[in-house]
């Protein structure tokens, strides 16, 4: 039996309004629990369009057929008009998710975090995280115990900033296994549960065809030597590719693969490490990557 952490990122208004209810129904039918990370502030995701001038981002948008994958409402959100606030407008959906799944903060403003947080000072970062946590806690009526940085934009500054919130764990980086990042003080920080497997948009049209993706991914899962964690997006697997996701769950069950919330992957003893800036094939720009203590 292979146990895989299932992380669901919710980046946009439509992903919350349309994708999350569909995913909740699918997961219920398959008796699966997951960790769902919500963006709760303004939906300004369309402002990423300026990145089309970067060849790597343009190629990603073309090979993943982004207009069909996400829809023009997502691709243009927050460009010619202020982005709609996601959280309170979809409070009932978020509360329903929290009844059955582990719920955490993805971001207050996903676009702002992904585009600008790398240049924020620590206090600006703390204020932004606090705003998102406060909003999500108002919606679900209980403390939020986990978070996942938007776009995996995380480094030592993010690790230090999140210590102020005493969360149970964060999932801010890519890597191989859960670990505790070392703080500037030399003490171990809040546990990190890295994503180990590629997302749909990172590999489609580059490493694998859409129709072959599920078999390709299951092969990666079964060969994973660490602690496998897979991320889906409400805007993708909850919308245009929900049938592919259902097929993945069916095939996974046949292969003895089970999915669980990320918190079930934690153990009492974890290795030490760091979150450093790095690059992942298929994704434009830097992102947080696990580095085991003592390695280079």
Curated annotation (Swiss-Prot):
Keyword Ribonucleoprotein in record: no
Annotated protein name in UniProt: Probable 4-deoxy-4-formamido-L-arabinose-phosphoundecaprenol deformylase ArnD
CDD domains: CE4_ArnD
Example of a GO cellular component annotation carried by this entry: membrane
GO biological process: 4-amino-4-deoxy-alpha-L-arabinopyranosyl undecaprenyl phosphate biosynthetic process; lipid A biosynthetic process; lipopolysaccharide biosynthetic process; response to antibiotic; response to iron(III) ion
GO MF annotation list: hydrolase activity, acting on carbon-nitrogen (but not peptide) bonds, in linear amides
Pathway: Glycolipid biosynthesis; 4-amino-4-deoxy-alpha-L-arabinose undecaprenyl phosphate biosynthesis; 4-amino-4-deoxy-alpha-L-arabinose undecaprenyl phosphate from UDP-4-deoxy-4-formamido-beta-L-arabinose and undecaprenyl phosphate: step 2/2; Bacterial outer membrane biogenesis; lipopolysaccharide biosynthesis
Leader peptide range in chain numbering: none
PANTHER family tied to this protein: 4-DEOXY-4-FORMAMIDO-L-ARABINOSE-PHOSPHOUNDECAPRENOL DEFORMYLASE ARND-RELATED, GLYCOSYL TRANSFERASE-RELATED
EC numbers on record: 3.5.1.n3
UniProt organism field: Escherichia coli (strain K12)
Family according to the record: Belongs to the polysaccharide deacetylase family. ArnD deformylase subfamily.
Expression induction: Induced by BasR.
Function: Catalyzes the deformylation of 4-deoxy-4-formamido-L-arabinose-phosphoundecaprenol to 4-amino-4-deoxy-L-arabinose-phosphoundecaprenol. The modified arabinose is attached to lipid A and is required for resistance to polymyxin and cationic antimicrobial peptides.
Keyword Lipid biosynthesis among UniProt keywords: yes
């Amino acid at each position: 039996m292979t146990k895989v952490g299932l992380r669901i990122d919710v980046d946009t208004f439509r992903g919350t309004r349309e994708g999350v209810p569909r995913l909740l129904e699918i997961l219920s039918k398959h008796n699966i629990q997951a960790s769902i990370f919500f963006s709760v502030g303004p939906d300004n995701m369309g402002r990423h369009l300026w990145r089309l001038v970067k060849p790597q981002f343009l190629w990603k948008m073309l090979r993943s057929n982004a207009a069909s994958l996400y829809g023009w409402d997502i691709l243009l959100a927050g460009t010619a008009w202020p982005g709609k606030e996601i959280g309170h407008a979809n409070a009932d959906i978020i509360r329903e998710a929290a009844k059955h799944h582990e719920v955490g903060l993805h971001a207050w403003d996903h676009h702002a975090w992904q585009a600008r947080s790398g240049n924020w000072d620590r206090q600006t970062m703390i204020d932004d995280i606090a705003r998102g946590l406060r909003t999500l806690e108002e919606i679900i009526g209980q403390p939020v115990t986990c978070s996942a940085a938007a776009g995996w934009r995380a480094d030592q500054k993010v690790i230090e900033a999140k210590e102020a919130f005493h969360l149970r764990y964060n999932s801010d980086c890519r890597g191989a296994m859960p670990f505790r990042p070392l703080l500037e003080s030399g003490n171990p920080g809040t546990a990190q549960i890295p994503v180990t497997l590629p997302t749909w948009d990172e590999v489609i049209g580059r490493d694998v065809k859409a129709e072959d993706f599920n078999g390709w991914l299951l092969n990666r899962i079964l060969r994973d030597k660490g602690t496998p964690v897979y991320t889906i997006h409400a805007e993708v697997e909850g919308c245009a590719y929900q049938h592919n996701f259902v097929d993945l769950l069916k095939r996974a069950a046949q292969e003895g693969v089970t999915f669980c919330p990320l918190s079930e992957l934690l153990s009492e003893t974890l290795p030490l490490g760091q979150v450093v800036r790095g690059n992942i094939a298929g994704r434009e720009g830097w992102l947080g990557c696990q580095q085991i203590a003592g390695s280079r």
